[in-house]
Amino acid sequence: MRKRNISLKSKIEIQKIFKEGKLIRFSNLNLKMFYKSNHLVYSRILVTFSKGFRGSVKRNRIRRLFKEAFRKRLELLEGIALDIIFVVSYSKLTLTYFSIESLMKGLVLRCERGIGESK
């Protein structure tokens, strides 16, 4: 069985999410989340960083943590197909896996309510 790709890669789709998607801000974490429903049967994620975010090791670690937390929380998104973009904007951020996982759980539930209201 082929592994499903949960990454969002198309430049056109990314621009569309930034323009038409809904925004959730977390000022205490310097984090923004854009989301929009998609035409697929599964959800996808993109983790991006502002220009001032220094250190590739830290960027890649945070990206891996977000993707793993998202992968583990996919069962919560059963039946809902979303494209989600996280924008992290501060490099002195101390994000642990558990904080990202709890954040992801709350965001998924918040997205479900947002998508449910727009239908």
UniProtKB/Swiss-Prot annotation:
What residue ranges carry the coiled-coil annotation? none
Root EC class: hydrolase
The reactions it catalyses are: Endonucleolytic cleavage of RNA, removing 5'-extranucleotides from tRNA precursor
Q: Which Pfam families match?
A: Ribonuclease_P
The EC number on file is 3.1.26.5
What InterPro entries does UniProt report for this protein, alphabetically? Ribosomal_Su5_D2-typ_SF, Ribsml_uS5_D2-typ_fold_subgr, RNase_P
Write out the entry's keywords from A to Z: Endonuclease, Hydrolase, Nuclease, RNA-binding, tRNA processing
The superkingdom of the source organism is Bacteria
Any one of the GO BP annotations:
tRNA 5'-leader removal
Q: Which GO MF term does the entry hold, naming one?
A: ribonuclease P activity
Q: Name one GO cellular component term.
A: ribonuclease P complex
Complex formation: Consists of a catalytic RNA component (M1 or rnpB) and a protein subunit.
Which family does the record assign? Answer: Belongs to the RnpA family.
Q: Which PANTHER family match?
A: RIBONUCLEASE P PROTEIN COMPONENT
What does the record give as the function of this protein? RNaseP catalyzes the removal of the 5'-leader sequence from pre-tRNA to produce the mature 5'-terminus. It can also cleave other RNA substrates such as 4.5S RNA. The protein component plays an auxiliary but essential role in vivo by binding to the 5'-leader sequence and broadening the substrate specificity of the ribozyme.
Protein name according to UniProt: Ribonuclease P protein component
Q: Which organism is it from?
A: Borreliella burgdorferi (strain ZS7) (Borrelia burgdorferi)
- Name the gene that codes for it: rnpA
